Amino acid sequence: MLSVMAATLNYIDEQVKGGLILPYFEDIDAEQWQEKIKVLDIYITDEVEGRELNLEARQKDYATNILSYPSDLPAAIIGLMPTLPLGELIICHAVMIREAAEQNKEAVQHISHLLIHGVLHLLGFDHELGQAEQDEMERFEIEILAGLNIPNPYN
């Protein structure tokens, strides 16, 4: 999992250097983004709790594969901190394993994709806002996965 997280953040770092603005971190300048160590929490849950959390967070009454809870700290507070908290990811293990089997994917490939997807949500990217946003997010995911020698999950 660490290699997936490192690849994701390295990719985003390069995109920020190229001018990408991160929706949830637009008040943080590129230099501060580059300097800070990024941190996040990852929690693994079961279907019962996953369903409860999805209902509470998204008003959807089923367990989903991954939930993202972005950090909402103001830039002024982040500026005082030694690290940059991105937020929390909650993975429903049973859903992730079931989806991998249904999609004929190795579990490690599927969890890698979900972690990348979740981190992008923590940064403010949202495929549910429209086709352009979905295309951008999927492009990021595909490029990061390719760097890890994992095939395009959308094929």
UniProtKB/Swiss-Prot annotation:
Function: Single strand-specific metallo-endoribonuclease involved in late-stage 70S ribosome quality control and in maturation of the 3' terminus of the 16S rRNA.
Listed SUPFAM superfamilies: Metalloproteases ('zincins'), catalytic domain (SSF55486)
Note accompanying the cofactor annotation: Binds 1 zinc ion.
UniProt protein name: Endoribonuclease YbeY
UniProt record, GO biological process: rRNA processing
Family per record: Belongs to the endoribonuclease YbeY family.
Subcellular location, record wording: Cytoplasm
EC number: 3.1.-.-
UniProt KW keywords: Cytoplasm, Endonuclease, Hydrolase, Metal-binding, Nuclease, Ribosome biogenesis, rRNA processing, Zinc
Cofactor(s), by name: Zn(2+)
Binding site for Zn(2+): 117, 121, 127
HAMAP family linked to this entry: Endoribonucl_YbeY
Major location category of this protein: cytoplasm
PANTHER family named in the record: ENDORIBONUCLEASE YBEY, CHLOROPLASTIC (PTHR46986:SF1)
Recorded GO CC terms: cytoplasm
Gene: ybeY
PROSITE patterns attached to this UniProt entry: UPF0054
GO molecular function: metalloendopeptidase activity; RNA endonuclease activity; zinc ion binding
Entry superkingdom: Bacteria
